[in-house]
From Swiss-Prot:
The modification 4-aspartylphosphate is found at D214. Coiled coil: none annotated. Residues 77-136 are annotated as: Disordered. Keywords: Phosphoprotein. This is Stress response regulator protein 1. Gene3D superfamilies: 3.40.50.2300. Pfam families: Response_reg. Residues 127-136 have a biased composition (Polar residues). SUPFAM superfamilies: CheY-like. Residues 163-281 form the Response regulatory domain. The keyword Phosphoprotein applies.
Length: 289
Protein backbone atom coordinates (compact mmCIF):
# COMPACT_ATOMS: atom_id res chain seq x y z
CA UNK A 1 0.00 0.00 0.00
CA UNK A 2 2.71 2.41 0.91
CA UNK A 3 4.59 1.37 -2.19
CA UNK A 4 1.60 2.28 -4.38
CA UNK A 5 1.25 5.67 -2.76
CA UNK A 6 4.91 6.32 -3.19
CA UNK A 7 4.79 5.46 -6.91
CA UNK A 8 1.80 7.72 -7.46
CA UNK A 9 3.58 10.56 -5.67
CA UNK A 10 6.66 10.08 -7.81
CA UNK A 11 4.53 10.04 -10.96
CA UNK A 12 2.80 13.27 -9.97
CA UNK A 13 6.13 14.91 -9.23
CA UNK A 14 7.47 13.79 -12.58
CA UNK A 15 4.44 15.20 -14.37
CA UNK A 16 4.82 18.48 -12.47
CA UNK A 17 8.45 18.72 -13.48
CA UNK A 18 7.58 18.09 -17.11
CA UNK A 19 4.77 20.65 -17.04
CA UNK A 20 7.08 23.24 -15.53
CA UNK A 21 10.10 22.69 -17.81
CA UNK A 22 8.10 22.18 -21.01
CA UNK A 23 6.41 25.58 -21.35
CA UNK A 24 9.58 27.33 -20.18
CA UNK A 25 11.65 25.78 -22.94
CA UNK A 26 8.97 26.58 -25.48
CA UNK A 27 8.72 30.19 -24.31
CA UNK A 28 12.48 30.57 -24.39
CA UNK A 29 12.64 29.12 -27.88
CA UNK A 30 9.80 31.34 -29.06
CA UNK A 31 11.42 34.45 -27.59
CA UNK A 32 14.74 33.54 -29.18
CA UNK A 33 13.14 33.06 -32.59
CA UNK A 34 11.17 36.29 -32.23
CA UNK A 35 14.28 38.24 -31.24
CA UNK A 36 16.33 36.76 -34.07
CA UNK A 37 13.59 37.35 -36.59
CA UNK A 38 13.03 40.96 -35.61
CA UNK A 39 16.71 41.78 -35.21
CA UNK A 40 17.31 40.41 -38.70
CA UNK A 41 14.33 42.31 -39.98
CA UNK A 42 15.59 45.53 -38.39
CA UNK A 43 19.03 45.12 -39.94
CA UNK A 44 18.20 43.74 -43.35
CA UNK A 45 14.99 45.57 -44.19
CA UNK A 46 14.64 48.78 -42.22
CA UNK A 47 18.19 50.13 -42.41
CA UNK A 48 18.75 49.45 -46.14
CA UNK A 49 15.50 51.24 -46.92
CA UNK A 50 16.77 54.29 -45.06
CA UNK A 51 20.08 54.20 -46.92
CA UNK A 52 18.40 53.77 -50.29
CA UNK A 53 16.05 56.67 -49.54
CA UNK A 54 18.93 59.00 -48.73
CA UNK A 55 20.95 57.76 -51.71
CA UNK A 56 18.06 58.33 -54.10
CA UNK A 57 17.50 61.82 -52.73
CA UNK A 58 21.16 62.72 -53.18
CA UNK A 59 21.33 61.16 -56.66
CA UNK A 60 18.34 63.16 -57.86
CA UNK A 61 19.89 66.33 -56.48
CA UNK A 62 23.22 65.58 -58.17
CA UNK A 63 21.65 64.98 -61.57
CA UNK A 64 19.95 68.37 -61.45
CA UNK A 65 22.88 70.31 -60.01
CA UNK A 66 26.08 68.86 -61.52
CA UNK A 67 26.13 68.80 -65.33
CA UNK A 68 29.56 68.14 -66.90
CA UNK A 69 30.53 70.85 -69.34
CA UNK A 70 27.80 73.24 -68.28
CA UNK A 71 29.42 76.72 -67.95
CA UNK A 72 26.71 77.80 -65.51
CA UNK A 73 28.06 75.31 -63.00
CA UNK A 74 31.74 76.08 -63.56
CA UNK A 75 34.02 75.41 -60.63
CA UNK A 76 37.26 77.41 -60.41
CA UNK A 77 38.95 74.33 -59.02
CA UNK A 78 38.39 72.70 -62.43
CA UNK A 79 40.21 75.54 -64.17
CA UNK A 80 43.97 75.12 -64.27
CA UNK A 81 46.90 77.14 -65.53
CA UNK A 82 47.93 76.27 -69.09
CA UNK A 83 51.26 74.97 -67.85
CA UNK A 84 49.72 72.53 -65.37
CA UNK A 85 48.93 68.98 -66.46
CA UNK A 86 46.28 66.67 -65.05
CA UNK A 87 48.60 65.15 -62.45
CA UNK A 88 49.70 68.55 -61.14
CA UNK A 89 46.07 69.62 -60.87
CA UNK A 90 45.30 66.56 -58.74
CA UNK A 91 48.18 67.44 -56.41
CA UNK A 92 46.97 71.04 -56.27
CA UNK A 93 43.57 69.86 -55.09
CA UNK A 94 45.27 68.11 -52.16
CA UNK A 95 47.18 71.32 -51.42
CA UNK A 96 43.87 73.19 -51.31
CA UNK A 97 42.84 71.14 -48.30
CA UNK A 98 46.17 71.74 -46.58
CA UNK A 99 45.99 75.48 -47.22
CA UNK A 100 42.43 75.76 -45.97
CA UNK A 101 40.75 76.29 -49.35
CA UNK A 102 37.21 74.97 -49.32
CA UNK A 103 35.13 74.04 -52.31
CA UNK A 104 32.06 71.83 -51.88
CA UNK A 105 32.06 70.91 -55.58
CA UNK A 106 35.40 69.21 -55.03
CA UNK A 107 34.49 67.41 -51.81
CA UNK A 108 34.56 63.66 -52.48
CA UNK A 109 32.25 61.33 -50.63
CA UNK A 110 33.27 57.98 -49.19
CA UNK A 111 32.10 56.40 -52.48
CA UNK A 112 34.48 58.55 -54.53
CA UNK A 113 31.69 60.66 -56.02
CA UNK A 114 31.88 64.42 -56.22
CA UNK A 115 29.54 66.07 -53.77
CA UNK A 116 28.29 69.66 -53.76
CA UNK A 117 27.64 69.49 -50.04
CA UNK A 118 30.01 70.82 -47.45
CA UNK A 119 31.11 68.16 -44.92
CA UNK A 120 29.56 70.45 -42.33
CA UNK A 121 26.18 70.62 -44.10
CA UNK A 122 23.54 67.90 -43.45
CA UNK A 123 22.74 65.85 -46.54
CA UNK A 124 19.05 66.59 -46.11
CA UNK A 125 19.53 70.28 -46.88
CA UNK A 126 19.23 71.06 -50.62
CA UNK A 127 22.03 73.21 -52.09
CA UNK A 128 19.60 75.84 -53.34
CA UNK A 129 18.31 76.48 -49.83
CA UNK A 130 21.06 79.01 -49.07
CA UNK A 131 21.82 80.51 -52.47
CA UNK A 132 20.18 83.82 -51.67
CA UNK A 133 22.68 86.53 -52.52
CA UNK A 134 23.63 88.75 -49.57
CA UNK A 135 23.82 92.48 -49.94
CA UNK A 136 27.23 94.15 -49.78
CA UNK A 137 28.34 97.68 -49.21
CA UNK A 138 31.55 99.37 -50.28
CA UNK A 139 34.51 98.35 -48.16
CA UNK A 140 32.35 95.87 -46.26
CA UNK A 141 33.88 92.40 -46.51
CA UNK A 142 31.50 89.51 -46.64
CA UNK A 143 30.82 87.94 -43.26
CA UNK A 144 33.21 85.17 -42.26
CA UNK A 145 30.08 83.15 -41.40
CA UNK A 146 29.13 82.98 -45.07
CA UNK A 147 27.30 79.78 -46.06
CA UNK A 148 29.88 77.57 -47.74
CA UNK A 149 27.28 76.49 -50.34
CA UNK A 150 27.70 79.95 -51.86
CA UNK A 151 31.06 78.81 -53.21
CA UNK A 152 29.18 77.05 -56.04
CA UNK A 153 30.17 79.03 -59.15
CA UNK A 154 27.78 80.44 -61.72
CA UNK A 155 30.39 82.03 -64.01
CA UNK A 156 33.30 80.97 -66.19
CA UNK A 157 36.90 81.91 -65.47
CA UNK A 158 38.09 85.27 -66.79
CA UNK A 159 40.61 84.75 -69.64
CA UNK A 160 42.13 88.22 -69.24
CA UNK A 161 45.93 88.39 -68.86
CA UNK A 162 45.98 90.63 -65.81
CA UNK A 163 49.15 91.39 -63.88
CA UNK A 164 48.80 91.05 -60.12
CA UNK A 165 51.16 91.82 -57.24
CA UNK A 166 50.67 90.11 -53.87
CA UNK A 167 52.44 91.61 -50.87
CA UNK A 168 52.30 89.72 -47.58
CA UNK A 169 54.96 88.75 -45.05
CA UNK A 170 53.25 85.37 -44.56
CA UNK A 171 54.01 82.87 -47.35
CA UNK A 172 50.93 80.77 -46.57
CA UNK A 173 48.64 83.76 -47.11
CA UNK A 174 50.42 84.46 -50.39
CA UNK A 175 49.91 80.90 -51.62
CA UNK A 176 46.23 80.87 -50.72
CA UNK A 177 45.52 84.11 -52.58
CA UNK A 178 47.73 83.09 -55.49
CA UNK A 179 45.81 79.86 -56.00
CA UNK A 180 42.45 81.63 -55.85
CA UNK A 181 43.59 84.16 -58.45
CA UNK A 182 44.82 81.43 -60.78
CA UNK A 183 41.46 79.68 -60.52
CA UNK A 184 39.59 82.88 -61.40
CA UNK A 185 42.12 84.25 -63.91
CA UNK A 186 44.05 81.27 -65.35
CA UNK A 187 46.00 83.48 -67.78
CA UNK A 188 47.08 86.06 -65.23
CA UNK A 189 50.65 86.83 -64.17
CA UNK A 190 51.38 87.04 -60.46
CA UNK A 191 54.39 88.52 -58.71
CA UNK A 192 54.80 87.78 -54.99
CA UNK A 193 56.70 89.74 -52.37
CA UNK A 194 57.21 88.93 -48.71
CA UNK A 195 59.41 91.98 -48.16
CA UNK A 196 57.25 95.13 -48.29
CA UNK A 197 60.33 97.33 -48.71
CA UNK A 198 60.73 95.96 -52.26
CA UNK A 199 57.31 97.13 -53.39
CA UNK A 200 58.49 100.59 -54.46
CA UNK A 201 60.97 99.12 -56.92
CA UNK A 202 58.53 96.46 -58.16
CA UNK A 203 55.77 98.90 -59.10
CA UNK A 204 58.28 101.08 -60.96
CA UNK A 205 59.70 98.22 -63.05
CA UNK A 206 56.44 96.32 -63.69
CA UNK A 207 52.95 97.42 -64.67
CA UNK A 208 50.28 95.90 -62.43
CA UNK A 209 46.53 95.95 -62.76
CA UNK A 210 45.93 95.27 -59.05
CA UNK A 211 48.17 95.22 -55.98
CA UNK A 212 46.95 93.04 -53.09
CA UNK A 213 48.31 94.34 -49.79
CA UNK A 214 48.46 92.88 -46.31
CA UNK A 215 48.06 95.71 -43.82
CA UNK A 216 50.15 94.57 -40.85
CA UNK A 217 53.70 94.06 -42.09
CA UNK A 218 57.08 94.87 -40.53
CA UNK A 219 58.95 98.08 -41.43
CA UNK A 220 56.26 99.37 -43.78
CA UNK A 221 52.52 98.73 -43.62
CA UNK A 222 49.97 98.30 -46.37
CA UNK A 223 48.53 101.70 -45.46
CA UNK A 224 51.95 103.33 -45.98
CA UNK A 225 52.41 101.64 -49.36
CA UNK A 226 48.97 102.71 -50.54
CA UNK A 227 49.48 106.30 -49.40
CA UNK A 228 52.79 106.55 -51.30
CA UNK A 229 51.29 105.06 -54.46
CA UNK A 230 48.32 107.42 -54.49
CA UNK A 231 50.61 110.43 -54.12
CA UNK A 232 52.10 109.56 -57.53
CA UNK A 233 49.67 110.08 -60.46
CA UNK A 234 51.45 107.41 -62.51
CA UNK A 235 49.82 104.77 -60.29
CA UNK A 236 46.28 106.13 -60.52
CA UNK A 237 45.32 103.32 -62.91
CA UNK A 238 46.53 100.62 -60.49
CA UNK A 239 43.91 99.08 -58.24
CA UNK A 240 44.75 98.45 -54.59
CA UNK A 241 42.95 95.79 -52.57
CA UNK A 242 43.67 95.17 -48.89
CA UNK A 243 43.66 91.56 -47.65
CA UNK A 244 43.70 91.71 -43.88
CA UNK A 245 42.21 90.69 -40.55
CA UNK A 246 41.82 94.35 -39.56
CA UNK A 247 38.32 95.11 -40.82
CA UNK A 248 36.77 97.27 -38.12
CA UNK A 249 34.81 100.33 -39.24
CA UNK A 250 37.59 102.78 -38.35
CA UNK A 251 40.14 100.58 -40.19
CA UNK A 252 38.04 100.60 -43.36
CA UNK A 253 37.73 104.38 -43.14
CA UNK A 254 41.52 104.72 -43.01
CA UNK A 255 41.92 102.41 -46.01
CA UNK A 256 39.48 104.46 -48.04
CA UNK A 257 41.25 107.67 -47.07
CA UNK A 258 44.66 106.46 -48.31
CA UNK A 259 43.23 105.22 -51.62
CA UNK A 260 42.62 101.51 -51.07
CA UNK A 261 39.83 100.48 -53.45
CA UNK A 262 38.46 97.46 -51.63
CA UNK A 263 39.09 95.22 -48.62
CA UNK A 264 38.91 91.43 -48.35
CA UNK A 265 38.88 90.00 -44.84
CA UNK A 266 40.98 87.03 -43.84
CA UNK A 267 40.38 84.13 -43.93
CA UNK A 268 39.36 84.14 -47.59
CA UNK A 269 36.13 82.14 -47.41
CA UNK A 270 34.36 84.25 -50.02
CA UNK A 271 32.16 83.16 -52.87
CA UNK A 272 34.48 82.97 -55.90
CA UNK A 273 32.00 84.88 -58.07
CA UNK A 274 31.97 87.64 -55.48
CA UNK A 275 35.78 87.84 -55.44
CA UNK A 276 35.93 88.03 -59.24
CA UNK A 277 33.21 90.69 -59.39
CA UNK A 278 35.00 92.89 -56.87
CA UNK A 279 38.38 92.58 -58.62
CA UNK A 280 36.86 93.29 -62.04
CA UNK A 281 35.01 96.27 -60.61
CA UNK A 282 38.21 97.73 -59.13
CA UNK A 283 40.04 97.31 -62.45
CA UNK A 284 37.20 98.94 -64.43
CA UNK A 285 36.98 101.89 -62.06
CA UNK A 286 40.73 102.49 -62.15
CA UNK A 287 40.91 102.30 -65.93
CA UNK A 288 38.20 104.96 -66.22
CA UNK A 289 40.05 107.41 -63.92
Amino acid sequence: MSSSVTNKSLDSLTLSAVSINGPSSTASSTHSNYTTQHSNQDYFSIKPKLKVSISNEISSTRSSEIIPGNPLLFSPLDCTNSEMDEEDDFEDDEDDENLGLINPLHHKSSHGQISDYSPLTPFTEPPSASLSKPSFTSHSPVSENIDINLVIRRKSANPATYNFLIVDDNIINIKILERILFKLYPNCNIKKLQDPTKVANAIKTHKFDVVFLDIEMPEITGVDISREMRQQPVFNSVGIIAVTTRTMAHDLLVYETVGIDYTFAKPLTYNYDFVMDRIDEVIRNRIST
